Amino acid sequence: GATEAKMFAREGAKVVIGDVLEEEGRKTEAEINETGGECIFVRLDVTDEYLWENAVSEAVARFGKLDILVNNAGIFRTERVEETSGALWDQVMNINAKGVFLGTKAAIPEMRKAGGGSIINISSGLALVGSDRASAYGASKGAVRLFTKSTAIQYAAEGIRANSVHPGIIETPMTLPTILNTEERREQSADRHPLGRIGQPEDIAYGVLFLASDESSFMTGSELVIDGGLTAQ
């Protein structure tokens, strides 16, 4: 998320960062503003409908309109079906899937006022293929994939586009403590990709930037797979 925010700011976008991690969010906000960008941070728990409405209101109050939304909050868990508690299932679904729904719902009225917009939902390669683990995670990201398509169909006539992004294994704060936490696991993860490496946040950010831009104006309801060939096998 921080990489995307900085890249958007460099391209001239006015950026609103929403996160429960206030220290990290404020740090990114300061870095963008200190380098000539325009950015504000708002505290946002993506499972809270009121906080989504507040975040959208803050964006419009500060910058005049809202025409891009990137839903990229998420948690990653690797439990198999019998290892997954009901509480864990609900937590993963609430953050990864419900959060996307609430953000989209809150943003659409302002995008309508703006004359259109682009919604980019970060899904996963595990929304496209099955997994020997990550039961709740894969299900949540599959929900994001199909919710994106429904959003695209419902709002295309109003100039509001919606597309999903499907990363492979990316080196982020979410994966570093889990599937990339040892050198052996890093090598194994790299070897799973035909391109022979782990993805970097910039690999995803460039795709998100494209989907937010007018260059992708004929894309909606699509899946942008950025996974080093992982799901092509």
Per-segment meaning from a language model:
Residues 80-81, 85-90, 185, 189:
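Substrate-binding pocket helix/loop in short-chain dehydrogenase/reductase
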Residues 109, 153-157, 217:
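Alpha-helical segment proximal to the catalytic Tyr-Lys
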Residues 124:
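Residue(s) in the substrate-gating loop at a strand-loop-helix junction
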Residues 129, 208-209, 220-233:
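Short C-terminal tail/terminal secondary-structure segment
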Residues 1-16:
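Canonical Rossmann dinucleotide-binding motif of NAD(H)/NADP(H)-dependent dehydrogenases/reductases
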Residues 104, 140, 148:
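Active-site helix of classical SDR
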